Amino acid sequence: MSRTGVLVLGPAGVGKSTFCNSMIAYMQSIGRRAHIVNLDPAANPTEYEFTIDVKDLISLQDVMEEMELGPNGGLVYCFEFLLNNLDWLDEEIGDYNDEYLIFDCPGQIELYTHIPVLPTIVRHLQTSLNFNLCATYLLEAPFIIDNSKFFSGALSAMSAMILLELPHINILSKIDLVKDEYSKKQLKKFLNPDPLLLAKQEDYINPKFAKLTQSIANLVDDFGMVQFLPLDCSKDSRSVETILSYIDDVTQWSEAQEPKEPHDEVELPDEVF
């Protein structure tokens, strides 16, 4: 039987851990079991305890102290160590077959753009552990205040889609921080990035910078791969429910579930009679 896993990616501070916690809370509320697998050797504890924590194998703080490395070099060392000890990950995942595993990944994008760390882990999960995987990439909504920054983030999302070669869902997180300043009509323009968003900006930025930003926006548009789903974890779970439905669709979660046998006898409460 295949397993289902979701990789949560994105720059530091975009709300990956909050999204993981919201996913767990919502899935528990509808009777589905899920677990967080922490792949960030520098992560702090969150609301929901990590079922599997890479810090049990190696932590960034220990590496920085013992190897005299900086944060980025230490993180690369940690993941190279993990790649050499994937049997530890296999043992920790063990018999989690019919439950969601949510992989909370570190925010350093060089782990999948510059060195093939995450792509290697993805291939291992697929081939050795029979996972159906989906990648989610979070970009925080305040990026839309600066259109050039938004398209830079969209380019990072697209690079993750291409390099990981997984079904991919992009998420515009922290939407509650901008929904009072932007109408729904304005926000929809960012959910499906359009280079025309830069038209009003060209008059007051450096011409060379404007040309570079326009080229990035056109590249994102030419590929036609990047769209975003809005995420608001502040009040209700409707956006989480919507995102989970997309994840279920691309991972074919429902098709992987074993059919449940009906009960032979149905007990009716006394008040029925």
From Swiss-Prot:
Residues annotated to bind GTP: G13, V14, G15, K16, S17, T18, S173, K174, I175, D176
UniProt key word GTP-binding: yes
Disulfide bonds: none
Gene3D superfamilies: P-loop containing nucleotide triphosphate hydrolases
Positions marked as site (Stabilizes the phosphate intermediate): N72
Keyword annotations: GTP-binding, Hydrolase, Nucleotide-binding
Renumbered ranges of motif Gly-Pro-Asn (GPN)-loop: 70-72
Chloroplast recorded as keyword: no
Gene Ontology biological-process annotations: mitotic sister chromatid cohesion; protein import into nucleus
Pfam families noted in UniProt: ATP_bind_1 (PF03029)
InterPro entries for this protein: Gpn, Gpn3, P-loop_NTPase
Annotated GO MF terms: GTP binding; GTPase activity
Assembly and binders: Heterodimers with GPN1 or GPN2. Binds to RNA polymerase II (RNAPII).
Family: Belongs to the GPN-loop GTPase family.
The protein's role, per its UniProt record: Small GTPase required for proper nuclear import of RNA polymerase II and III (RNAPII and RNAPIII). May act at an RNAP assembly step prior to nuclear import.
Protein's name according to its UniProt entry: GPN-loop GTPase 3
Source organism: Candida albicans (strain SC5314 / ATCC MYA-2876) (Yeast)
